């Protein structure tokens, strides 16, 4: 191990001490040794990805951390290790990477330690961009091109033309990113870059096989396609030919480096006559179209998708006017790579609509909302028809649709709702489609020029604006543009800039169906779109008010956004009004935060959606909004699942108090257990924390149980006095409510509901005796209490209990220590003893608390302990060891004044 540096050994030793074997293996695989990662470490990590109890996010975070090292060797090896796991590891690993907002932000990486560092830094930047692109394409396609079946019955060979036209540009983008590695044989001078080159070489062969299958599929169906599709297919084929040359050059390098020729495929180009034939066919289609501008062109495409829609000729006339905007060809833009869509948008536009309609939008025209969802259900639809193409196509489409704007505006507002209108069927289809498209379009393209995102986020869920939204999302940001999505993007632009900028206040359904939610007010939409938006604004305003949190029920439907899984099934919920469940925890990656319906409660807290990168619920969450108070502070806490990777908690616009408490609690949870417990504000919501501490896989894949709504209690509301009582609230959701301090029925009710902070507050005040209800007792006790408080126990006891309860410290020892006191209802007696126990709420909390947090608490205890001792016996009682009986007698003398108050009240 001579190549290892001292820092390598120290890092490995640190992880060994903390018991993280996976993190240790990552460190071992990414040492400063100038050689590729060792097979034994890679094999260990691959095996780890297949274990159900391994924390994939933690593994990925450790790799990202190593990739921030200043040494090119460590960074390069971290990239190689990540690539190896993406290729050979369990698919959960690449799924998680695809769900992240950012991966490798190494676009500016430079190791100035030596000339070798300069050279290697160049390849590190290119390599990281390819890995980002690989994860991004997985996010859009929901499968890895390198893993899917190839050949005559492979995925690309059997894919429908519409989907194929959308997926080919994505595949092209991934191949381009790989070819940009552009290494020469004389630059493969060390084991690290050699290891990377081998992985790239193997990837290229698999990707090119898919590419070839896709082109074959296109050519087989070329003569059956509509004009717009033919144009796109021809453009894809031309690009294929140019890439073929570059691929052959890459393979030559592999051959020179010594890779067995048997492993290198021979590429033979098709005869040039094929290209001529394809162009002639396209020209014939073009020739027919001018003669009968809409007649032949539009009907044929329409007829293909749904003959009945040929009636849409009236729409076609507006389309003609649209012709002026040539580049709009939906499919062309869909190919993203192909701006050629010079074909007259008019027919293309119509063609587009029918295509989508066939996909499910047009068919759904009558039952609009549900059908689009149904259509979308096929992942292909998401990929091929709407979402993928939407990125680029929607924007253009939006402009085109402008001509329709006057007519569609009403339909658009009702787009998904009333697409049924036959006359506007095509136009509405477009809008509905765009909405669906936006599903992925905005979500992924959404590096929505941060500014537009804010507008999009706007709560107004104007359905029509989806087009604008998509437009915004894609405006200037071509999802396929080489720069976009690369590590180079700023953190906000993150590779998948899917999350709306945190700034967007609109909690509504910003991400899921960002496009639909786009408020008409969004300034970003193209002027044309703006007009449409303006027209629709009135209607949308009404709709928005009705669906406020439901976020335009239709819009929420797209939440099926989960890229991986139900992701494609945008459940018909779209039509459904605010289904709280809307694609609830479909999200493979949704953390509890996403799956827990309570979040939706208050639209404001919902903003946490930014945190939920992929969580469908983030979008759907608003629908559950029916439960007002649940806006659990925890949502952010849950998010911590990924270690605050998304840092959403901070940005969430939850009520200030809630946000603060929740964010601190959750962040602290994962940040450092000890520290978090000390934090006074951490919300006591234990359920969420339990989830946080779980292996995370459940949470990661949406299986985690939604945190109990009862936990929604917001500790921050109770400030000073509440600190003592707060613990009782924490256990509220937990099984042993009996031990709760507040015996009053009102209190119990508030606990159970956990939804009405005001009522719970009032009940707490009543218990304290501050309210008029117990004026006599309260006043007397309060005065006496104050005297004691001044005694000096004042500051200690108060603070300690608060931190304990908030920190979820109820450790098992504490339980044992106070069992009699707390287990018995404080009212029962044990005046002083019972009160402190209840006040701290330790036992109850302990019962419900996750075991994991408890241990950390134990570590924190010593720190809390001295203050307790100083304060008086009560502190000692808190310590785990003392026996409850002996402690209780001692307590009375120094018992907390507040505790005394409560007991008397109960008596």
Swiss-Prot record:
- Indicate where the modification Phosphothreonine is found in the sequence: 317
Query: Where does this one sit in the cell?
Result: Cell membrane; Membrane, Coated pit
Q: Which UniProt keywords apply?
A: Cell membrane, Coated pit, Glycoprotein, Membrane, Methylation, Phosphoprotein, Protein transport, Transport
Modification after translation, per record: Thr-310 can be modified by the addition of N-acetylglucosamine which can be further phosphorylated. There is no evidence for direct Thr-310 phosphorylation.
Q: Pull one GO CC term from this UniProt entry.
A: clathrin-coated vesicle
The ranges of region (Disordered) come to 285-326, 342-380, 393-414, 505-525, 867-907
Q: Which Pfam families match?
A: ANTH
Omega-N-methylarginine modification sites? 865
Positions of post-translational Asymmetric dimethylarginine modification: 865
In the record, biological process GO terms are: clathrin coat assembly; clathrin-dependent endocytosis; protein transport; regulation of clathrin-dependent endocytosis; vesicle budding from membrane
According to the UniProt entry, which residue ranges have a biased composition of type Basic and acidic residues? 893-907
Q: Where is the ENTH domain?
A: 14-145
Source organism superkingdom: Eukaryota
Cite the domain annotation text.
Possesses a three domain structure: the N-terminal 300 residues harbor a clathrin binding site, an acidic middle domain 450 residues, interrupted by an Ala-rich segment, and the C-terminal domain (166 residues).
Q: How does it assemble?
A: Binds AP2A2. Interacts with AP2B1; clathrin competes with SNAP91.
Under what name is this protein listed? Clathrin coat assembly protein AP180
Gene behind this protein: SNAP91
